[in-house]
Amino acid sequence: MASGDGANGGGGGGQGKLPRKRFYRARAHSNPLSDSHFPIPISPDEVDLSQHYPRYFPSGEGEARQGDAAVPRIRFADVGCGFGGLLVGLSTLFPDTLMIGMELRDKVTEYVKERILALRASNPGKYDNISVVRTNSMKYIPNYFRKAQLSKMFFLFPDPHFKEKNHRRRVISMQLLDEYAYVMEVGGIIYTITDVEELGEWMRSCLEKHPLFEAIPEEETKADPVVKLLSTATEEGQKVARNGGQTFQAIFRRISLQE
């Protein structure tokens, strides 16, 4: 990964000043099927973790140590992380877990980088376990993660792509669930939430039909501290709450293939 792709260096965030969103305006969504220009690792071994987590990986060692089973690995992925609210909330809830946000929009990615740098500068010893990368998760998930590497994946308020001809752009589909299942460990959890009922039904239906995922009972999700963050940590979730809107969750566990 090219230098500077992670939350390590550059910008005013290093002085502890949180960035202002008005300087990072971008479209609400991007077309995931279009070709964008940004560096893509050939394989997970090419991901230089020192660019993302300098506290855990001294400069230049992140890439070389990726194959070492003893070193920390990214365990959570927030796909389409937006302005990084979920990452910030999860960081203190799981302070010893490496997690990354994956965002296609360049200005939004830059905002999250600066936000993380500012949080690290003003809270020494905290927020070192989160980072962000600009990438297209619908194309390059296997380039970043090994088989069974992730324990949690998040898809919060994704683009609904209302038109039927654009449903192939949706970030949850049977084909993409194959890839997500590959990078998730058995027992790992996939979290989805939306304020669009039709999309909520679509995501739930895809997950129910896929042989490598099963729904988690409601009583179990109520005991999961992560679930509350789904609707409260992100800008989109807060907007829905302010407007008195309804949300639709689908939370599923990665299972092994039934014989």
From Swiss-Prot:
EC number, as in UniProt: 2.1.1.33
Pathway as given in its UniProt record: tRNA modification; N(7)-methylguanine-tRNA biosynthesis
Transmembrane segments annotated in the record for this chain: none
Pfam families given in the database record: Methyltransf_4
Residues of the active site: 159
Domain of life: Eukaryota
Main localisation: nucleus
First-tier enzyme category under EC: transferase
Annotated keywords: Methyltransferase, Nucleus, RNA-binding, S-adenosyl-L-methionine, Transferase, tRNA processing, tRNA-binding
GO molecular function annotation: tRNA (guanine(46)-N7)-methyltransferase activity; tRNA binding
UniProt-listed Gene3D superfamilies: Vaccinia Virus protein VP39
A GO term from the CC aspect: nucleus
InterPro entries according to UniProt: SAM-dependent_MTases_sf, Trm8_euk, tRNA_(Gua-N-7)_MeTrfase_Trmb
Chain's role: Catalyzes the formation of N(7)-methylguanine at position 46 (m7G46) in tRNA.
Family per record: Belongs to the class I-like SAM-binding methyltransferase superfamily. TrmB family.
The protein's name: tRNA (guanine-N(7)-)-methyltransferase
